Amino acid sequence: MTKPDISEWIAKADGDYTTALRENRARKAPNYDAACFHAQQCVEKYLKAFLQKRQVPFAKTHDLGVLLDACLVHAPLLEGWRDRFEMLSQYAVLFRYPGESAEQGDAIKAVSAMKSFRTEMRSILGLEPG
């Protein structure tokens, strides 16, 4: 299997972005678990796109802190995202299985962080705000 290129990472990230927004905005039967999960996935994939662009190797991980650490050499200002990444990282698995469920407040925070980070990363990557 070949490594995905940057555009593939971004396309997958934007698919997660759209899904997170849709689930968070749903009036009838919103799926806040999915909104949180896809918000985390969007951020994860933008971090991986950044690392791929900078030709920085990275392990298969959903831990945004680990990915952030790999990014800091090239973008030290991303350190300011660490607290929000700690919140988002737990959503990679927390609400995926029985026993825990996201509430509206969780989804609002996750989607807000995702939207802000996506805007910043698109700028860093030289992409249109879209």
Where are these regions (language model features)?
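Terminal alpha-helical segments
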Residues: 1-130
